[in-house]
């Protein structure tokens, strides 16, 4: 049997049963008869959301895909309510169906390994795909597909251990989200990639069009920043040349705590955050991923109906990662809002009078904080971070 055929066989077994049930212990390569030096993150030259094409370049590349919907006579309507068509530029596509009152909400995403635990990598990949639906206030996903490229640099033993673990993590996260993985595509490739497609059919009242921010709203962020810094710092523990750059500002214990905080944050679904958007009358949201906090805030601001701008004053950051970022010079640009995040939190425009209750509710339901980080003011549809933002150190959870 060929290597590619083996991959497909492993995929079928994992998605339809036959995998090892004892998968929730922290990944130890030696426990699976792999070399102690095995690192999943070595099977790609880029890390996580570092695979993103720069935002300005991407806008030019996809311009040919844009459609002129203004040429249509009118938007589809249901019960005398216009159903918007949302395409390139936001988190999901929202396409009115020919069946009255229903829309297809769909998104796709993939990236390279960012952590070395294959099971957690699968969970993070699934959470990252679903996050685009959650950013639209959609809380129920009807179906998922998995997209997986197995590195040709893996030995058969490495492949047979790692790939089922990734798939199990992806599948378990989908089950946690109340959906299932019904198929996908598995290929071989020089670099390992993991991702998927999330689709749902819903009525207009089940999603929140992200264009209704008004002056006086506040900006809420539901996960801390600094995931990219944390995973890089963790890898540098074994790289003396890089570790020497940061060891004066952070200890190994600090880095390991930050890494586990980042890993758990990335694997956590934004589903509760999305559900509460409806309860507290959110005016729009986006999720923070590869373009960083400021990049995604600028995209969201640019799509608002009213002449508003976003001003960010506070930056919740995984503990000690702001110091690490500063020690690395301009490498991450974390405090400037340009550091990539993977499966980050939702950035939500909420009425000022309801934002505190939203934050309190999310902490009550999930045990995690959310933060008011900025305001919506009159402006020209831009976003900025003030010169000296307040950094909120977010400690690891016990």
Curated annotation (Swiss-Prot):
Tissues and organs where the protein is expressed, per its UniProt entry: Expressed at low levels throughout the embryo. At later developmental stages, expressed in areas of high cell proliferation. From embryo stage 13, expression is high in central nervous system and midgut, especially in the gastric caeca. Expression also seen in larval imaginal disks and brain.
GO CC annotation, single: cytoplasm
Keywords attached to this entry: ATP-binding, Cell cycle, Developmental protein, Kinase, Nucleotide-binding, Selenium, Transferase
A matching Pfam family: AIRS_C
Molecular function per GO: ATP binding; kinase activity
Signal peptide feature range: none
Keyword Magnesium set for record: no
Biological-process GO terms, alphabetical: negative regulation of reactive oxygen species metabolic process
Domain of life, per lineage: Eukaryota
Family affiliation: Belongs to the selenophosphate synthase 1 family. Class II subfamily.
Function: Plays a role in apoptosis and consequently a role in imaginal disk patterning and growth.
PANTHER family from the UniProt entry: INACTIVE SELENIDE, WATER DIKINASE-LIKE PROTEIN-RELATED (PTHR10256:SF0), SELENIDE, WATER DIKINASE (PTHR10256)
Full protein name: Inactive selenide, water dikinase-like protein
Source organism per UniProt: Drosophila melanogaster
